[in-house]
Amino acid sequence: MNPGEFDQLVEAAFRRIPARFRKRMANVALIVEPEPPPGRVGPGYTLFGLYEGRPLTHRSVFEPIAMPDRITIFQGPHERLARSPEHLASMVEDTVWHEVGHYFGMNEAQVRAAQRRRRTNR
């Protein structure tokens, strides 16, 4: 898949996040990269996305405005593991939701629990 098509999958996944959450996402950049940076993930692990920033729950109104937080979605790992175009779109959506959960201050266990609930409610 070319990068533009993958970007469209990421954008569509982000648009499916309920507006009440998207409205609260200020100063965050949604970025697509071909691969995770070397050394970011250990052997035997796959990194689909990465949230970098200060979670919303850890911010103060007294803090100065900072550089944008970043949610990066990695194209290569998704494409290598996807079994079909539909599966790829589903994986991308799961990854976007996962990283948005981190933006809102959820730890890994909380994000995974929310993902399980979301999957059963689809």
Kindly give the residue locations of the regions a language model identified.
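Amphipathic alpha-helical interaction/coupling elements
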Residues: 9-12, 91, 95
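Short alpha-helical functional segments enriched in proximate histidine and acidic residues
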Residues: 16, 20, 95, 99, ...
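An acidic/histidine-cluster motif and surrounding catalytic segment
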Residues: 1-43, 49-63, 77, 115
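Hydrophobic/basic alpha-helical segments enriched in Actinobacteria
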Residues: 22-23, 27, 88-90, 98, ...
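Active-site scaffold of zinc-dependent metalloenzymes
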Residues: 47-93, 103-122
